[in-house]
């Protein structure tokens, strides 16, 4: 069972730096720190799970939840001591994506910088591939 934790925004990026990793998803230091902070007082959870749902004006949106277990079909990303699990349905949509955590005066949110996105809605919450 999982519990929803945060909103997520997507951004289409034209190019992505080539990183020496085989993971479908990489995390920025800001994202790693936020994930550690979120899990600090929650020993019952082993990490975060990224999923994708049909929703919004552009078709798809990412979900981000706490998770207590790894499903057999989940892909695990282990980076800098944090574990992020990717649901099977989201794996192809996340290839080459960078997960960041951005704080401004008005909001704080995880941002998925995804080179595979063909279009996003005006608010950035939904996308199509």
Swiss-Prot record:
Gene3D superfamilies: HesB-like domain (2.60.300.12)
NADP listed as a keyword: no
Record's keyword terms, sorted: Iron, Iron-sulfur, Metal-binding, Mitochondrion, Transit peptide
Organelle transit peptide residues: 1-12
Binding, Fe cation: 57, 121, 123
GO process annotations (BP): heme biosynthetic process; iron-sulfur cluster assembly
Subcellular location: Mitochondrion
GO molecular function, one term: metal ion binding
Single GO cellular component term: mitochondrion
UniProt entry tagged with the keyword Iron-sulfur: yes
Function description: Involved in the maturation of mitochondrial 4Fe-4S proteins functioning late in the iron-sulfur cluster assembly pathway. Probably involved in the binding of an intermediate of Fe/S cluster assembly.
Family: Belongs to the HesB/IscA family.
UniProt protein name: Iron-sulfur cluster assembly 1 homolog, mitochondrial
Native source organism of the sequence: Danio rerio
Gene: isca1
